[in-house]
């Protein structure tokens, strides 16, 4: 304690203060008094010692095999430094990892995930320590799959992480997969890596997005893709117009098997290089129509095959080509026989042409139904009529709703003859009013059906096209209507009953005048790609835009889509020899500007076979843009 001098003690005690202090005390300073005063000067304050504390930064880290992580030790109350250890072993060892005097920790070459504790102890007082936890991630494993262009990348990330793979022809990579989250309880994650050229070496590495939003990079791996027989590959020639900028992404083709090519689905880059294929290896003459990328990263395909329905198959496959679900026409008939829904107790020939996956997980499919009819116009004898049914399958693929063309349309209207009466080739869902819109090629109509998410009565709300419910604006009726069309799709919101519809107008038997003259006999048929603005209240259809600057004739199939960049892409599937109805055994896919006149930005020629549909998709992974 301070001596009581009768005056406040000075804030700072110097040697001169100490002398003056001694003069004011009644007795001379004793050794003890001097020691206490000197203690005050030195800051010991009666023998109290400064507390030592050690902390390490970062508190946790993720490291790969042999990767170096630098830790920093902060010591308060001492300047003598620290000694480093790993799992209690001074400087560590090859099993747990090593750490040098500067805090540089080198992870061990672990074959499985493990953890290590890095510690720093004060040299002055070894009981004062700080520690950090290191999660050591074993290198990923890359393996081949049944698809020679797809690798399976497996790695075990920390809990709460997500895994994506970046890959490319060198270590700058360039492409990435989507993110796959780690299992909640921990465990390995496998990602199928697709989008690589045939017979090429690629580099790839996993990117782990950790729970704290930091990232960890796996080591680089090399993978070499395989080859396919040259005779099985499509003949493709892709060209970008000089100065043109096509919509980025990849091209998804579903091909009609011709000759030796049995590949049902093909994905290419915009240079025409094949990046992914699927061979269904189905017997008979099954062909894909169509193939669509699902939100889970799988492809859903519909195959139209033999008329007995055995080879009419729907398949869901992953990128490696493994079938995860399938349903044959025969299995659909079994489900229909057991279904309690109204009208479901029928027999169908098989699924065909299109399907729609609904937001609630239901699947809408098109199937054929045959009936023998009598007394039809132009057919004095009984005749088999092939109509269509639209079937709603729930999440378990059980039929819960059915619509039949026989219940709603006039059998005496058969523009393209019999038995193929309706030939429905498109079904889409209208989310704004919960209706279904279908395209009937052989009626040259697009129909809207009261579906109401499975509660509708199936009433035909309107018929769009020649002899339908709408009047044509900005065009001449009947020749500017669409005929034998494909791939009708909504390209704008429909909340007010006014929306735009895009389709591919094949143009078969186009009616040229009021007397019913059709193309083909004298006037060549032409295909078009119109955008129609529909007003459901006034029942008007206004031609907003049409591509017919370079007339060509596709006598069957085809597709048309509005791209993200505003351009329009369409597939002239069944091209014919110019000026004739003779098939040319080729298809042309074009991306054009949405201008008048349209300008071609990009095109692909498919030689020796046909592309039933062609779609530009962002990548092989939902939500990822390449």
Task: Give residue ranges: language-model regions.
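Bacterial Sec-dependent N-terminal signal peptides
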Residues: 32, 38-57, 131-133, 137-141
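Surface-exposed loops/turns
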Residues: 65, 101, 112, 198-199
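Short, well-ordered beta-strand segments
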Residues: 79-92, 131
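Extracellular/luminal low-complexity segments enriched in Ser/Thr/Pro
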Residues: 100-113, 192
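Hydrophobic beta-strand segments within extracellular beta-sandwich modules
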Residues: 116-118, 204
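Short, exposed coil/turn segments at beta-strand boundaries within extracellular/luminal domains
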Residues: 123-131, 212-217
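Short, surface-exposed linear motifs at loops/turns and structural transition points
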Residues: 138-228
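Histidine-/acidic-rich catalytic cores in large beta-rich domains
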Residues: 207-213, 220-626
